[in-house]
Amino acid sequence: MSKPSLELKGASFTLSVLHINSSDLNAVMAELDSKLAQAPQFFLGAPLVVNLSAIQDNDFNLHGLKELLLSRQLVIVGITGATTALSNQAKTLGLAIVKAGKQSVTPPPAPRQTKVLKQNIRSGQQVYAKNGDLIIFGAVGNGAEVIADGSIHIYGALRGKAMAGAAGDSSAVIIAHSLEAELVSIAGQYWLAENLQQHSSDKSGCIRLNGESLIVESLPL
């Protein structure tokens, strides 16, 4: 029996949500450009859902926002939290209207493997622990990236980027002896350096998800 020419299957993906809190596109783009400069590769080509719940202006220039994001190689795939007028505007632009769904109560499968490295990870290097945790006995330098489908443990300074729960595991954590990261991310929720500095003093800590927000906890001495 020949295979059908197409199949329609259900699947779930982790998407970043861009919250727009101002109708002033110049101000929005100036702030976005500042964030992109801190982690350009992380956002490059990233599909975004735009949350417009803070925008009540029905004349908001959604087309202009879409074009400005495209010029920065960011792609709007849909909007959420919009007024009826803005939702209609989105439909004419070919954007999906996304409704926030309830989180699944079924926990993801536990990582099956652990990748252990006894070395420093230098600028330009990338390490990925697929289907498991990543343990590094060393430092992660500026410009380096460490990624794991499970948790990340760094017995040294974290100065680069660390992305745990890359496959969507919201129970993953990032632990480091010194939190000085350019970017940290768990299951798609991320902090840039400026966010991390507000919650940490370059000391050891454990970053995890609390609902849909990242938090950092001190490690016992």
From Swiss-Prot:
Disulphide bridges: none
An individual GO BP term: regulation of cell septum assembly
Annotated SUPFAM superfamilies: Cell-division inhibitor MinC, C-terminal domain
Superkingdom, taxonomy of origin: Bacteria
The protein's role, per its UniProt record: Cell division inhibitor that blocks the formation of polar Z ring septums. Rapidly oscillates between the poles of the cell to destabilize FtsZ filaments that have formed before they mature into polar Z rings. Prevents FtsZ polymerization.
Quaternary structure note: Interacts with MinD and FtsZ.
PANTHER family: SEPTUM SITE-DETERMINING PROTEIN MINC
Protein name according to UniProt: Probable septum site-determining protein MinC
Organism listed in the record: Shewanella sp. (strain ANA-3)
Lineage, uppermost ranks: Bacteria, Pseudomonadati, Pseudomonadota, Gammaproteobacteria, Alteromonadales
Chain's gene name: minC
